[in-house]
């Protein structure tokens, strides 16, 4: 799994002009399978140092068990050893208690809050996360977690300092354009453009850029695309499709995109 994320998936994204980054870690749900958890922890340090890894995560609590706590702490130490930021998963159940516990444990391990992105926040947790100096991230999902309307209300109330709007292309129902659509709604509701750009772009770059693996020039000065290239003998071409070959100068930029 980790080899695929850092290998073929990185290659596949690049073949379509997408710069691929990832976090690596043992998710709290899997931490309760001790045999699996030990196997993952044995190999994780090797993958944490790979190109394109911008944080250790998502880690944290789900059911808030002793095993989750053990592997959360172990991965915080790995983040310290590798000088990587941390991406924290806050639990879906008993979220406030799990969030407070996550922050307390980070501080027990001497992790600088500026290196920690706390994800899946809501109206209950935002005050504490921001007051204690952490990055407060919000996952925009259809029907669950945080929606665009609620997110815009939070931006209006709290501003954009250390706030990150994110989303996912999940295995289930998701909205890959949720961040862009939230940004558009925020602008329509009168949130200052500078604040929207921070919450939907700049803060994520600042937080994950601390890894040394992500910088704006990666996409402002992108590599060329050559879909004739192979990865371990594998091509992204299917069904007789003609390969795309583009030099950087003909690539689209953010100014060419019109998201409605």
Region annotations inferred by a language model:
Residues 22, 58, 79, 136, ...:
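Conserved, mostly hydrophobic/aromatic
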Residues 1-83, 88, 93, 100-101, ...:
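Mid-domain alpha/beta scaffold segments of enzyme catalytic cores
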Residues 158-176, 196:
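Short acidic/histidine-rich active-site segments
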Residues 30-38, 139-148:
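Active-site glycine- and acidic-residue-rich loops that bind
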Residues 180-260:
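Mid-to-C-terminal alpha-helical segments outside catalytic/metal-binding sites
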Residues 23-25, 56-57, 116-121, 137-139, ...:
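Active-site neighborhood of phospho(di)ester-bond hydrolases with catalytic His/Asp-centered motifs
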Residues 66, 96-103, 126-132, 145-156, ...:
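Histidine/acidic-residue-rich catalytic or RNA/ligand-binding cores of hydrolases
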Residues 52-53, 74-75, 80-85, 106-113, ...:
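Glycine-enriched alpha-helix->loop->beta-strand junction motifs that scaffold or abut catalytic
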């Amino acid at each position: 799994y980790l080899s695929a994320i850092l290998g073929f998936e990185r290659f596949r994204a690049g073949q379509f002009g997408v710069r691929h980054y990832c976090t690596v870690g043992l998710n709290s749900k899997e931490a309760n399978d001790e045999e699996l958890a030990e196997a993952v922890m044995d190999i994780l340090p090797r993958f944490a140092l790979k190109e394109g890894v911008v944080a250790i995560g998502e880690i944290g609590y789900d059911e808030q068990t002793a095993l989750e706590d053990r592997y959360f702490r172990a991965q915080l130490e790995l983040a310290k050893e590798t000088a990587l930021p941390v991406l924290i998963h806050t639990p879906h159940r008993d979220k406030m208690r799990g969030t407070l516990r996550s922050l307390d444990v980070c501080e027990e391990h001497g992790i600088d809050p500026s290196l920690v992105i706390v994800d899946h926040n809501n109206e209950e947790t935002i005050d504490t996360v921001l007051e204690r100096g952490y990055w407060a991230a919000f996952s925009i999902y259809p029907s669950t977690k945080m929606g665009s309307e609620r997110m815009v209300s939070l931006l209006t109330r709290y501003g954009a300092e250390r706030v990150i709007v994110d989303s996912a292309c999940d295995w289930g129902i998701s909205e890959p354009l949720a961040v862009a659509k939230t940004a558009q709604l925020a602008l329509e509701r009168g949130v200052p453009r500078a604040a929207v750009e921070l919450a939907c772009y700049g803060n994520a770059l600042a937080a994950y850029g601390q890894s040394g693996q992500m910088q704006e020039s990666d996409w402002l000065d992108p590599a060329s695309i050559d879909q004739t290239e192979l990865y371990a003998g594998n091509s992204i071409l299917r069904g007789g499709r003609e390969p795309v070959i583009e030099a950087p100068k003909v690539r689209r930029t953010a100014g060419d995109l019109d998201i409605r």
